[in-house]
């Protein structure tokens, strides 16, 4: 199967240039200023358009069983929404239940995804329990047969997913040994649990209780703590869904000291804020429930985008985990029972373009970096993914920077009945999405085939991650001080009949006079 993209401007993370792109059997086979079409070759006209690498969303939760419900976007609907928005690969999370084998959970996720995906996908593994067997299974799943190169640790959701600090630290030591990336959901789960109990007992049962139970300081504290522990373990760390300025500042602090830390803001946090939690319409407020919550500071979205521009944050994701209005309403009398999660996989690319490029904060090359290339590099599938180059997979988007669209639940492809970006007009629209040489989105219509996507194994030892770790490790090697053997001085026992003199002095503490013996 072949196709030719003509007259476009190729945008990679490091260059922009006009060129044609020839695709054959799922790969890019030629890039040249002008390629003549052969008879029968399908041609995509990209005049006045950008030709960019397909987006990579490194953080999704398709059909996740969570809080007694199952996320509505399964691997079919979720990946259809992805390609409609210009994303051609997702990285989803295998999340075992407490005490469950990683291998059993892995097989379950592959069984869900393989028959349904319409684009390529990879997997990351959550560690929800700890012990020697888990450590052994971590090593197993980093082998080529499984293709896992990152492990996520939750410092929230006490009693469900959360691990203790010592378990987190031991897990990071194992990650470092395996040359795998540690990822962290950074919140203070113990304090959150106490705050939830206090708020409920005080009569605060609505969605506003969610954000009040999770003040930004707790995200910042947990992020700082996680970075500190990762630094001690000399383990690279990837902080998922950075939602606040404080968390971003914690990452920047440790990076300046040489720690290898990556920060991931998400579409929701770049486009809207936590004022929704105080909306008088209960259901409106509940739709935005996620953890960590959206920042109550309205300047945060713009600040996070500027940190992406400055390289203090590194790539964008969505944490796509969708629950419909009925599922959200299960927590109508108790905010802790509202399923956590929002949409984003369809709208991320347009949101980042609108809030970043159209706003004049980032350029098109940086857009490609934070929506595709950095994810490919960090998760070790570059340049197969994340680049327009000969030999790369033909995951390509023809992008119209001048077009606009209005986001709506009535036109999106998610399996839910609302959209957190409802009514937002965004600049930048994917006109054509190509997955491994197949057009899957064009003219506003899906052309997908269920199960046509493929699993992409992600090998450990990413160069962009571990080259810095290795350099840092040399400076952190323990230093032994060579000393002459210490010879203790033997003291003679005191004479029991010797007079013992006790010296005293007066001390005058505030409020009175006292004689204190020393």
UniProtKB/Swiss-Prot annotation:
PTMs per UniProt: Carboxylation allows a single lysine to coordinate two zinc ions.
Needed cofactors: Zn(2+)
Residues the entry annotates as binding Zn(2+) 2: 152, 185, 241
GO molecular function: dihydropyrimidinase activity; metal ion binding
Chain sites annotated for binding Zn(2+) 1: 59, 61, 152, 319
Keyword S-adenosyl-L-methionine listed: no
Note describing how the cofactor binds: Binds 2 Zn(2+) ions per subunit.
Sites of N6-carboxylysine modification: 152
The UniProt record lists the keyword Transmembrane: no
A single BP term in Gene Ontology: pyrimidine nucleobase catabolic process
InterPro entries: Amidohydro-rel, Hydantoinase/dihydroPyrase, Metal-dep_hydrolase_composite, Metal_Hydrolase, Metallo-dep_Hydrolases_sf
Gene3D superfamilies: Metal-dependent hydrolases (3.20.20.140), Urease, subunit C, domain 1 (2.30.40.10)
PANTHER family documented for this protein: COLLAPSIN RESPONSE MEDIATOR PROTEIN, HYDRANTOINASE/DIHYDROPYRIMIDINASE FAMILY MEMBER
Assembly behavior: Homotetramer.
Protein's name in the database: Dihydropyrimidinase 2
């Amino acid at each position: 199967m072949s196709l030719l993209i003509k007259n476009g401007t190729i945008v990679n993370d490091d260059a922009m240039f006009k060129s044609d792109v020839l695709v054959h059997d799922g790969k890019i086979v030629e890039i040249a200023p002008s390629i003549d079409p052969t008879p029968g070759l399908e041609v995509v006209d990209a005049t006045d358009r950008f030709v960019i690498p397909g987006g990579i969303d490194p953080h999704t939760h398709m059909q996740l069983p969570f809080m007694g419900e199952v996320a509505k976007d399964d691997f079919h609907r979720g990946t259809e929404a992805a390609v409609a928005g210009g994303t051609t690969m997702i990285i989803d999370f295998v999340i075992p239940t407490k005490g469950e084998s990683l291998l059993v959970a892995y097989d379950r996720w592959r069984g869900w995804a393989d028959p349904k995906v319409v684009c390529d996908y990879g997997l990351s593994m959550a560690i929800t329990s700890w012990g020697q067997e888990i450590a052994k299974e971590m090593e197993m799943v980093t082998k080529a047969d499984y293709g896992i190169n990152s492990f996520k640790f939750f410092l929230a959701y006490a009693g469900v997913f959360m691990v203790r600090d010592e378990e987190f630290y031991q897990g990071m030591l194992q990650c470092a040994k395996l040359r795998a990336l540690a990822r962290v959901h950074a919140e203070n789960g113990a304090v959150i649990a106490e705050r939830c109990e206090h708020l409920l007992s005080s009569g605060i049962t609505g969605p506003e209780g969610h954000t009040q139970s999770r003040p930004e300081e707790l995200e910042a504290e947990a992020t700082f703590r996680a970075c500190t522990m990762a630094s001690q373990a000399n383990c690279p760390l990837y902080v998922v869904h950075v939602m606040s300025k404080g968390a971003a500042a914690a990452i920047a602090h440790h990076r300046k000291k040489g720690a290898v830390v990556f920060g991931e803001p998400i579409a929701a946090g770049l486009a809207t804020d936590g004022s929704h939690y105080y909306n008088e319409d209960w259901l409106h407020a509940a739709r935005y429930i996620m953890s960590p919550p959206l920042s109550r500071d309205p300047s945060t979205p713009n600040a996070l985008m500027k940190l992406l521009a400055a390289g203090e944050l590194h790539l964008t994701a969505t944490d796509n985990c969708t629950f419909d209005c009925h599922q959200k309403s299960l927590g109508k009398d108790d905010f802790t029972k509202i399923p956590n999660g929002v949409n984003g996989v369809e709208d991320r690319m347009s949101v980042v373009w609108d809030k970043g490029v159209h706003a004049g904060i980032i350029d098109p090359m940086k857009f490609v970096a934070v929506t595709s290339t950095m994810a490919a590099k960090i998760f070790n599938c570059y340049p197969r993914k994340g680049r327009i180059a000969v030999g790369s997979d033909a995951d390509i988007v023809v992008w119209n920077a001048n077009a606009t669209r209005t986001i709506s639940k009535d036109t999106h492809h998610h399996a839910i009945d609302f959209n957190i970006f409802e009514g937002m007009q965004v600049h930048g629209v994917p006109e054509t999405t190509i997955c491994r040489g197949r057009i899957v989105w064009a003219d506003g219509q899906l052309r997908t085939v269920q199960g046509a996507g493929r699993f992409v194994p992600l090998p450990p030892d990413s160069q962009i991650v571990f080259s810095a770790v290795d350099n840092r490790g040399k400076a952190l090697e323990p230093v032994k001080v060579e000393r002459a053997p210490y010879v203790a001085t033997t003291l003679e026992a005191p004479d029991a009949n010797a007079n013992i003199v006790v010296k005293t002095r007066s001390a005058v503490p505030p409020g009175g006079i006292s004689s204190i013996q020393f």
